[in-house]
Amino acid sequence: MTTQVPPSALLPLNPEQLARLQAATTDLTPTQLAWVSGYFWGVLNQQPAALAATPAPAAEMPGITIISASQTGNARRVAEALRDDLLAAKLNVKLVNAGDYKFKQIASEKLLIVVTSTQGEGEPPEEAVALHKFLFSKKAPKLENTAFAVFSLGDSSYEFFCQSGKDFDSKLAELGGERLLDRVDADVEYQAAASEWRARVVDALKSRAPVAAPSQSVATGAVNEIHTSPYSKDAPLVASLSVNQKITGRNSEKDVRHIEIDLGDSGMRYQPGDALGVWYQNDPALVKELVELLWLKGDEPVTVEGKTLPLNEALQWHFELTVNTANIVENYATLTRSETLLPLVGDKAKLQHYAATTPIVDMVRFSPAQLDAEALINLLRPLTPRLYSIASSQAEVENEVHVTVGVVRYDVEGRARAGGASSFLADRVEEEGEVRVFIEHNDNFRLPANPETPVIMIGPGTGIAPFRAFMQQRAADEAPGKNWLFFGNPHFTEDFLYQVEWQRYVKDGVLTRIDLAWSRDQKEKVYVQDKLREQGAELWRWINDGAHIYVCGDANRMAKDVEQALLEVIAEFGGMDTEAADEFLSELRVERRYQRDVY
């Protein structure tokens, strides 16, 4: 694989400093490197003694608090950019993760900014669930002295677009808060809206918040920035796909791939619990089909981010073709005056259903029209990377990263269709072929700091991925804590992902217990939540012993069913009523003993 040299313009070190750093760390293990990273982070964030000794009186410096509630990293990036803007304006600002925010202090906030995404069916990001629940409970305080603003990120292809932001905005107002600005709901292409909103927030706050003296400017609460790398979503690493192995059986209804990617000597680091971002290319055959349906040639010039490209290239590399949205359907109907689609306009439910069941290319096939190239480009959304839970630990695989990919395949009236990123990895990248990747760090899905702490892992289907990483790490660390896995899929013989590895972990004593749910191997369907109830007494003993609970997989059904089963176990074996059980689980979440990576 070609050596990846980090772009020098992106590095804060000069070549001599970089060489000294590499020489000093060349013989460190991954665990030692992680410790060093944390050590320097701590050094960086220790306030100078002189500042600590002479803090400004609180009355003179009503600070601004930014709460970042992020699921995939976009909300965090917006919050960090706003923090930097406010510091540049010499305003006193604190940035915190929603999961780290002591929400009972919200009554004392004078200036509060919330940047949030939405997941599942309108739920807040995992790290903001406890805060959201608190604000909507009877315990929520009045906020008459709080001025606030909310920036909400979402995806208009989903029914509950930006619902989390709408919730926070309406509840903060209901509790007596004063809106600094109207809420902004941003779609997938959020950057321009975020930039404009940040400028408006700075202007609004400059007129209300006292300017901090240079010696008092506080850059506290930098969110998830202990991870420094020249590679990012906007500057991905060009890595190499080394393994593409189908790990479901020949007769399985699912096509699940184990993908290994060689990071070479890039120095890219990750931890168990992180996600891998993958930039993909659309299938050239799909591009050709769409272009021909619109009576275009593919060589028409179009403008993409200020650059002129041939239409075929723009569609393959820059635009989303495999996910339709209600907005696209509505705009296409209006643009083409389609007799089939125009009756849907104005009916949100029908538009959502049509978009969910009809890919863009089939919408054009069923309602043909002739568009010019620029009109087509303006209709589509920008291509965005897909995130996959990482299925490996660098303590074992070193300069590789593994992911578990469920390939999306389906038919539309006899025509085969596939997911953009999953089919790219499974079908279109040759071994040793290039893949553009980056790490999306997730500090809200981490193994316990204490290696003696028991771990309960619940991950049906491809939700098993991060727990493979967890076990590799626990084995490498020789962690004495007990480990319990709940896994489920349709059939034992066809769908037992990584079966040999789990059996080895059981044999070696690394995996203390494993409970399996095969939903189609018997007349009565059995799911992981049924296994949780079945093992309720033992599960409660583990929880009482301080176990951390992890859930990974489908957010819309599985995660809710699993949470309901956990609540029932806590109520029954903990001797609690429903309300007390809910409060108990919320406390586990606040203590980082109940963590979820759901999508």
From Swiss-Prot:
Q: Which family does it belong to?
A: Belongs to the NADPH-dependent sulphite reductase flavoprotein subunit CysJ family. In the N-terminal section; belongs to the flavodoxin family.
Quote the pathway field: Sulfur metabolism; hydrogen sulfide biosynthesis; hydrogen sulfide from sulfite (NADPH route): step 1/1
Per the UniProt record, which residue ranges are transmembrane? none
Q: Does the keyword Cell inner membrane apply?
A: no
State the encoding gene. Answer: cysJ
Q: Report the CDD domains cross-referenced here.
A: SiR
Q: What does this protein do?
A: Component of the sulfite reductase complex that catalyzes the 6-electron reduction of sulfite to sulfide. This is one of several activities required for the biosynthesis of L-cysteine from sulfate. The flavoprotein component catalyzes the electron flow from NADPH -> FAD -> FMN to the hemoprotein component.
Question: What is annotated about its quaternary structure and interactions?
Answer: Alpha(8)-beta(8). The alpha component is a flavoprotein, the beta component is a hemoprotein.
Q: Where does FMN bind?
A: 70-75, 117-120, 153-162
UniProt: FAD binding residues: 322, 356, 386-389, 404-406, 410, 419-422, 599
Q: Which EC numbers does the record give?
A: 1.8.1.2
NCBIfam families per the record? cysJ, PRK06214.1, PRK10953.1
| Cited InterPro entries | CysJ (IPR010199), CysJ-like_FAD-binding (IPR003097), CysJ_Proteobact (IPR029758), FAD-bd_FR_type (IPR017927), Flavdoxin-like (IPR001094), Flavodoxin/NO_synth (IPR008254), Flavoprot_Pyr_Nucl_cyt_Rdtase (IPR001709), Flavoprotein-like_sf (IPR029039)
Q: Can you quote the record's cofactor note? A: Binds 1 FAD per subunit.
Q: What domain of life?
A: Bacteria
**SUPFAM superfamilies xref list:** Ferredoxin reductase-like, C-terminal NADP-linked domain, Flavoproteins, Riboflavin synthase domain-like
- The protein depicted here goes by the name Sulfite reductase [NADPH] flavoprotein alpha-component
Give the required cofactors.
FAD; FMN
Q: Which HAMAP family match?
A: CysJ
One biological process term from GO is:
cysteine biosynthetic process
Q: Which residues does the UniProt record annotate as the domain Flavodoxin-like?
A: 64-202
Reactions it catalyzes: hydrogen sulfide + 3 NADP(+) + 3 H2O = sulfite + 3 NADPH + 4 H(+)
Chain ranges of the FAD-binding FR-type domain: 234-448
GO terms for molecular function, please? flavin adenine dinucleotide binding; FMN binding; NADP+ binding; oxidoreductase activity; riboflavin reductase (NADPH) activity; sulfite reductase (NADPH) activity
Keyword terms, alphabetized: Amino-acid biosynthesis, Cysteine biosynthesis, Electron transport, FAD, Flavoprotein, FMN, NADP, Oxidoreductase, Transport
Amino acids binding NADP(+): 519-520, 525-529, 561
Q: Top enzyme class of this protein?
A: oxidoreductase
